[in-house]
Amino acid sequence: APSPRDVDPQREACAAEVAAAYARESPTPTATRRYAITAAPAEVQQFDGRLLKVWAYDERVPGPILRVRLGEELEVKLTNRLPQPTTIHWHGVRVPNAMDGVPGVTQEPIAPGASYTYRFVPKDAGTFWFHPHVRGAEQIERGLYGVLIVDDREPLPYSRDEVWVLDDWRLGPDGQVDPRFVTRHDLAHDGRWGQAITVNGDAAKEMVVRPGERIRLRLVNPSNG
């Protein structure tokens, strides 16, 4: 346990104020959607047939789509099988302070072999994504990201959902993910380009839309480029 001198009173007071404000706004959930996912090294097949060594949620890139309806509680248990600590940050989602996934600020990092359960009621419908906030330039680039969809309370008038997750991959001479995740060149040029572009982890495919069909296209761009 931290000693009194390790605790930042201002930070603790701010966290308590944010948590209290969130609690005042949060209604009783109508139901709970539960998921259990694992972050671990994996191999996925790229569109050219190459087996790419990645880090992934549930052995897929992008990770699983998590879905919850507005008013429901989302509960996600993350188990860490990576060789380094990790967390989940819910990008663009208004969550309680303790659920924000910022290591050393809102939670301690999840150590290799450990688990952590995130639990909150989303306040807004929409398309969001989740990813680590520990060594993000590396862990996201290795493939750790997924989609969170918060559906409206009542169905909207469209025919079907299409989710496109766009990413670029910087590969080394061996055809694997380049381990130089942040270089001076990247910093000087405000980013970098990858050699391979994927949509949902594969080459872009033609989407057929029938006359009169209404599509809800959900775009997520975790690309580091």
Language-model features: locations:
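Flexible loop/turn segments at secondary-structure boundaries
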Residues: 45, 97, 172-173, 225
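Histidine- and aromatic-enriched segments that form or immediately flank copper-ligand environments
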Residues: 34-155
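Transition-metal
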Residues: 1-51, 73, 77
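Short amphipathic alpha-helical surface micro-motifs
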Residues: 11-22, 27, 36, 71, ...
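Short, glycine/small-residue-enriched coil/turn segments at secondary-structure junctions
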Residues: 28-30, 61-74, 202-214
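Extracytoplasmic/periplasmic copper-protein system
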Residues: 3-29, 143-171
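Acidic-aromatic/histidine active-site loop/patch
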Residues: 160-213, 218-224
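A general structural signal for short secondary-structure junctions and capping/turn motifs
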Residues: 25-29, 79, 138-140, 154-157, ...
